[in-house]
């Protein structure tokens, strides 16, 4: 099991999301069950990872590397260290707990759990990635689910819900309310979060490309870049 433990943790939520695509919205308990099982698999594997990690040995362990583009130096390179291991476990716990906390959701249940599973998997992928390309890929993958979860299933502030039009009618009774990006709406909060994340993502992308360009190694591999930095007497 330990040979593929990171793959179980990472791809169980993805597999659950794919399975939910083919599930029927008319069977909400089946939808919740699929989400819970996939999250449970990821949690059990994360617990195993947490206790199997050797803190005495330290460093990155349970490493997997799958070449994606040798020409560009891109690979699905996974591994965890003493910091990444508890973060992966925490993400799996939050996903599993989130499934049951949101058990009462009846509005577009299937879509909610699909995006929740994708968000969790992307977050876990960030903590596992030892390749800058995939680290950035998983980071960006988490942005869309966050926007949709906040914008569609989030909650407006009390002040926003009490807004009325010129005739004194509740604005939430109008169609325009759905697309209102006023300062107290959930859509505004979601959009603001995405803008902040995207702005910093551009800065991160520029940094990654500069590292790739000036390292001279033609690779996004974090471990290789770290060793190269040590040889160049660059603090890492």
Name each region found by the language model.
Residues 17, 46, 207, 235-236:
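Small-residue hotspots
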Residues 10, 14, 24-25:
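N-terminal cofactor/phosphate-binding cores enriched in small/glycine residues
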Residues 15-17, 95-96, 118-124:
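Hydrophobic, membrane-inserted alpha-helices
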Residues 1-5, 19-100, 104-114, 218-227:
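Transmembrane helix-loop-helix hairpins at membrane boundaries of multipass inner-membrane proteins
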Residues 11, 35, 92-95, 120, ...:
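Small-residue faces within membrane-embedded alpha-helices
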Residues 2-12, 80-91, 133-145, 236:
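Structural signature of hydrophobic alpha-helical transmembrane segments
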Residues 26-28, 111, 115-118, 122-235:
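Alpha-helical multi-pass transmembrane bundles of energy-transducing inner-membrane proteins
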